[in-house]
């Protein structure tokens, strides 16, 4: 280990959403004097507007600052800010790989939450030093002693090491930096060995191309070096290398233990994927850093412009967004009802919301989304196996041997009094209870296995409303299970509406179908003829509603006179309606689609 390495500390902050992670990062950077009055703003490391508004971190970020400790030494602090949401767990695991220790924040007024535990396990897997920090001790509801007990019992950490702070007011934040210098070890690594560096994030800049954020484990890299990306074998030359002091700051190079960035004229983020290993072309390392994997989408939906003329703009926008989001996958598709659009794959529901919001906000598009679905496995009688995420590709029932759907292991942490509500919700969502653990007298951890398709359909909203917002949720994939799945079509005037088709569990088909057709009945305007709206599986109608016809008074012009004259006019009208019904197209207004798809989302 070089002398320089002794005084480097690489650490990350992990926490449940809203426990004060970005606020603590702001205070640490103020002490490190990398922010001044001009650059100072809340959530410095959250660079997107959407991150600030929602109060969440989406992209992993970092900052380097110097700290003069009480022992008289100046330490180089590398803070890696990580996303807190379950959708971005892979990004968190790669950022943690670049660290030697973590600050684990627990809100002293809320206690331990589901994602606190999930992120703690990620840190333990990487064998990192874990430093507990109790935040928000300035709040009247804060209970430091109770939080200490939870840190001992629920997390299995030494509460004596826990630092009690208020990130908002800055109270005791300096003690956190002192604890980092004492508790978190200096980075190991051979400064003279062949280069081995981890890409823990990358983003696209319109002027510089792809900016790669790296942590160097062995060796060093400088401007002009030719390097290899190990998973693809592609090589590039370094144009600029440096560290991030909020603004990118070029340096002579990066050595073992250091965290920084490099620019090499790379055009696509997919050429420098998170988790990949960089080594020198002239003296490559033998093995890459373990743990790299491709991000797999879990949730899929159709994305269409409300105004069909905006399709070319949507193509342009989604390709630009892809430059910054390697996990996003998409392919063109068309729908009779909605026109041309895309089938898009996301990491999870939050990722889906963020992609849509960014497309609408940054590219000024009006979009409509079809109901989210997951990837199903269909085993056919012919021996073929198909993976489908789009109801339109669901094969004929007669050809199917079995169907499988993805399940997740979901952990819910809730106050004691809401356990009954959650059990009822999980039962309704076809959940299987695996475990119940009392974390404290009034906090319970429930573990369930449930279908991902049920989790993405209203589960989170219902969980929050059933527990008045107190419950927290975390989930991870747990493989596929055989399930009785069917394709449900919605027929309007006998014609299936492709945008409203969905794959559902046989036991849920009637209930879901009824919800949709009741909504459509209120939204489709009346026509001159009666319109049946039906939910059907195969040839079987599960539910039906009718929109009654508008009645035109054709006998109004007959004043008294012969009854046969009136009958003749009524018969003529009847004939006309019959013909109209056969050839009449029912226009489904855009609002009807939006409203129905909203229920599905």
Curated annotation (Swiss-Prot):
Compartment(s) where it occurs, according to its Swiss-Prot or TrEMBL record: Cell inner membrane
GO MF annotation, one: GTPase activity
Domain tr-type G span(s) in chain numbering: 6-188
Gene3D superfamilies in the cross-refs: 3.30.70.240, Elongation factor 4, C-terminal domain (3.30.70.2570), Elongation Factor G (Translational Gtpase), domain 3 (3.30.70.870), P-loop containing nucleotide triphosphate hydrolases (3.40.50.300), Translation factors (2.40.30.10)
Main location: membrane
Catalyzed reaction equations: GTP + H2O = GDP + phosphate + H(+)
Biological processes, Gene Ontology terms: positive regulation of translation
Class of the enzyme per the UniProt entry, highest EC level: hydrolase
InterPro entries: EF-4 (IPR006297), EFG_III/V (IPR035647), EFG_V-like (IPR000640), EFTu-like_2 (IPR004161), G_TR_CS (IPR031157), LepA_C_sf (IPR038363), LepA_CTD (IPR013842), LepA_IV (IPR035654)
Positions of GTP binding: 18-23, 135-138
Name of this protein: Elongation factor 4
Organism in which the protein naturally occurs: Leptospira borgpetersenii serovar Hardjo-bovis (strain JB197)
Organism taxonomic ancestry: Bacteria, Pseudomonadati, Spirochaetota, Spirochaetia, Leptospirales
């Amino acid at each position: 280990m070089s002398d320089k390495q002794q005084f480097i500390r690489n650490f990350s902050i992990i926490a449940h959403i809203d426990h004060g992670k970005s606020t603590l990062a702001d205070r640490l950077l103020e002490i490190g004097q990398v922010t001044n009055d001009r650059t100072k703003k809340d959530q410095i490391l959250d660079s997107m507007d959407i991150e600030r508004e929602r109060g969440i971190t989406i992209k992993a970020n970092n900052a380097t600052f110097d700290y003069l400790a009480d022992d008289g030494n100046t330490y180089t602090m590398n803070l890696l800010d990580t996303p807190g949401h379950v959708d971005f767990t892979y990004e968190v695991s790669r950022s943690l790989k670049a660290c030697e220790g973590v600050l684990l924040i627990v809100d002293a007024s809320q206690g331990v939450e589901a994602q606190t535990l999930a992120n703690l396990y990620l840190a333990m897997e990487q064998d990192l030093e874990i430093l507990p920090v109790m935040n928000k001790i300035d709040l009247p509801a804060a209970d430091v002693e109770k939080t200490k007990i939870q840190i001992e019992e629920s997390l299995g950490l030494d509460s004596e090491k826990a630092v009690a702070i208020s990130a908002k007011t800055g109270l005791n934040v300096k003690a956190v930096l002192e604890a980092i210098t004492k508790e978190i070890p200096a980075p190991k690594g051979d400064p003279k060995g062949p280069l081995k560096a981890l890409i823990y994030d990358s983003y696209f800049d319109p002027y510089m191309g792809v900016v790669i954020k790296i942590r160097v484990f062995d060796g060093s890299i400088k401007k002009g070096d030719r390097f290899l990306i190990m998973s693809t074998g592609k090589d590039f030359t370094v144009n600029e290398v440096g560290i991030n002091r909020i603004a990118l700051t070029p340096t002579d190079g990066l050595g073992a233990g250091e965290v920084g960035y490099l620019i090499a004229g790379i055009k696509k983020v997919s050429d420098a994927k998170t988790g990949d290993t960089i080594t020198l072309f002239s003296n490559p390392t033998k093995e890459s850093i373990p743990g790299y994997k491709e991000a797999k989408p879990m949730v899929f939906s159709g994305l269409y412009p409300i105004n069909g003329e905006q399709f070319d703009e949507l193509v342009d926008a989604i390709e630009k967004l892809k430059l910054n989001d390697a996990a996003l996958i998409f392919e063109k598709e068309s729908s009779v009802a909605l026109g041309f659009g895309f089938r898009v794959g996301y990491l999870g529901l939050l990722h889906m919301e963020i992609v849509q919001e960014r497309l609408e906000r940054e590219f000024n598009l009006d979009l409509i989304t079809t109901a989210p679905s997951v990837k199903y496995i269909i085993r056919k009688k012919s021996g073929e196996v198909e993976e489908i995420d789009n109801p339109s590709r669901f094969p004929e029932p007669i050809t199917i041997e079995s169907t499988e759907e993805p399940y997740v292991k979901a952990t819910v942490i809730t106050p004691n009094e809401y356990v009954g509500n959650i059990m009822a919700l999980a039962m309704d969502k076809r959940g299987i209870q695996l475990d119940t653990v009392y974390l404290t007298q009034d906090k319970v951890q429930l573990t369930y296995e449930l279908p991902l398709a049920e989790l993405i359909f209203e589960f989170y909203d219902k969980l929050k409303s059933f527990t008045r917002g107190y419950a927290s949720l975390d989930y991870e994939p747990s493989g596929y299970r055989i399930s009785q799945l069917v394709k449900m079509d919605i027929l309007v005037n006998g014609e299936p509406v492709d945008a409203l088709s969905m794959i559902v569990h046989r036991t849920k088909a009637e209930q879901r179908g009824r919800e949709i057709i009741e909504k459509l009945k209120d939204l489709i305007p009346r026509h001159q003829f009666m319109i049946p709206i039906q939910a059907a599986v195969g040839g079987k109608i599960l539910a039906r509603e009718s929109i009654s016809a508008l009645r035109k008074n054709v006998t109004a012009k007959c004043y008294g006179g012969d009854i046969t004259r009136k009958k003749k006019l009524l018969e003529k009208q009847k004939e006309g309606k019959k013909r109209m019904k056969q050839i009449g197209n029912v226009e489904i207004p855009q609002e009807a689609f939006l409203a129905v798809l909203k229920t599905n989302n």
